From Swiss-Prot:
Protein name: Large ribosomal subunit protein bL35
Coiled coil: none
A GO biological-process term: translation
Pfam family, one: Ribosomal_L35p
GO cellular component: ribonucleoprotein complex; ribosome
GO molecular function, one term: structural constituent of ribosome
InterPro entries: Ribosomal_bL35, Ribosomal_bL35-like, Ribosomal_bL35_CS, Ribosomal_bL35_sf
Region of interest (Disordered), residue spans: 26-50
UniProt similarity note: Belongs to the bacterial ribosomal protein bL35 family.
Highest rank taxon of the organism: Bacteria
SUPFAM superfamilies, A to Z: L35p-like (SSF143034)
Keyword terms, alphabetized: Ribonucleoprotein, Ribosomal protein
Length: 63
């Protein structure tokens, strides 16, 4: 049986931590930043942990 391929679209969007959590960058930091406060922009910059059900699906896509 051939090796399982990684879904590169998923690999570009998430990363795994050493403990196995799946991290993703939030939305809202691409454009229209001039009306957002510095506090809001700092909060949006942080990476978030995916929810359990979504993380399970992502790990399947990553192989």
């Amino acid at each position: 049986m051939p090796k399982m391929k990684t879904k590169t679209a998923a690999a570009k969007r998430v990363r795994l931590t050493a403990t196995g959590k799946v991290m993703h960058a939030g939305s809202g930091m691409r454009h229209n930043l001039e009306h957002k406060s510095a506090r809001k922009r700092r909060a949006l910059k942080r990476d978030d942990v995916l929810q359990t059900a979504q993380a399970k699906k992502m790990k399947g896509l990553l192989g």
